[in-house]
Amino acid sequence: MSGTTPDGSPGPGSSSAAIRLGTVVLDCPDPHALARFYSGLLGQPVDPDGDDDWQSLAGNGSGVVLAFQRAARHVPPSWPDGAPQQLHLDLTVQDMATAHARAIELGARPLDPEADPASDEPRRFRVYADPAGHPFCLCR
């Protein structure tokens, strides 16, 4: 349903009523370091307007920005454990072995080390932690 409601206000689906995701922010102890990690992993440049407390990647055309905010008392999430994850990123890749090697080179830590990315049996995803401990997946 789109358009207006009976009282004339914007209805669901109306562009003026839409709420859109603009930025995903990861808390971390070092925004510069985490921005460099994701810049290298995603191939997006770091926005030059950041500072010591806030860094972000330049847009990728999706309209969603990935940003990194200093949190002095950041505690990395633990995975896996009994508590549910608060958030993780699913990053789409074409070649799992190449993406795995790049993630490791940049400082990612595999969280499912029993999986072999070069195996003949294709895996649909691999789970990692970024340098600040946030979980993310590389997904086919």
Where are these regions (language model features)?
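Vicinal oxygen chelate
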Residues: S2-P29, P48-D49, S56-N60, V64, P77-R102, ...
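Surface-exposed beta-strand edges and their flanking turn/coil or helix-capping segments
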Residues: P6, S39-L41, W79-A83, R102-I104, ...
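N-terminal presequences and immediately downstream first alpha-helices
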Residues: V25, R36-L57
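Amphipathic alpha-helical segments
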Residues: D30-P45, A103-G107
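Acetyl-CoA-dependent GNAT
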Residues: Q69-H74
